[in-house]
């Protein structure tokens, strides 16, 4: 994956629509745990860069990599640490978008080096795509969709401007 990321250096943005939630099982840090009784192998592995560290370094060097997040209602997540600003006008947009209690994150080291994080969801439970949400409410945080975050990173924007009903005398008509 690091090599693939390096090959996309000229792309305006590169995105991964999968979640890297667990350490690479073939990385040196994982192999050291598996073969902890083989001191010679552990010594060699300790001098080898871990695959996840190499991937994180590649993401950082690229500068415009966007990673996906998987919203769910199975867990309660920590606060979303977006890489963008947010200007909200009008009613609270979280009232109008799909709420989730949690999300499956990527490894911390990968998220720290990424340029953006976007939600990967089709906004319903029946797996039929009717609409693609622009934002989702994940544990009280407004999280952009992966496609929207890719565009933000590709054009170099730093902030989202979200206009909800009542922003410019527009009425919600009691609908959420």
Name each model-derived stretch:
Residues 1-176:
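Non-transmembrane functional regions of envelope-associated proteins
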């Amino acid at each position: 994956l690091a090599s693939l990321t390096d090959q996309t250096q000229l792309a305006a943005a590169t995105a991964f629509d999968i979640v890297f939630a667990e350490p690479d099982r073939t990385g040196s840090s994982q192999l050291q745990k598996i073969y902890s009784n083989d001191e010679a192998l552990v010594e060699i592995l300790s001098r080898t860069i871990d695959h996840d560290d190499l991937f994180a370094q590649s993401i950082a060097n690229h500068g415009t990599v966007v990673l996906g997040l998987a919203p769910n209602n199975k867990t309660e997540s920590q606060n979303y640490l977006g890489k963008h600003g947010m200007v909200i006008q009008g009613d609270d947009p979280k009232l109008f978008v799909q709420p989730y209690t949690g999300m499956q994150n990527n490894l911390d080291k990968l998220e720290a080096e990424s340029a953006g994080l976007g939600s990967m969801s089709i906004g319903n439970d029946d797996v039929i795509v009717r609409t693609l949400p622009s934002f989702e409410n994940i544990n009280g945080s407004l999280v952009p969709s992966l496609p929207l975050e890719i565009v933000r990173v590709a054009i170099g924007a730093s902030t989202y401007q979200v206009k909800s009903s009542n922003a410019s005398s527009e009425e919600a008509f009691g609908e959420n």
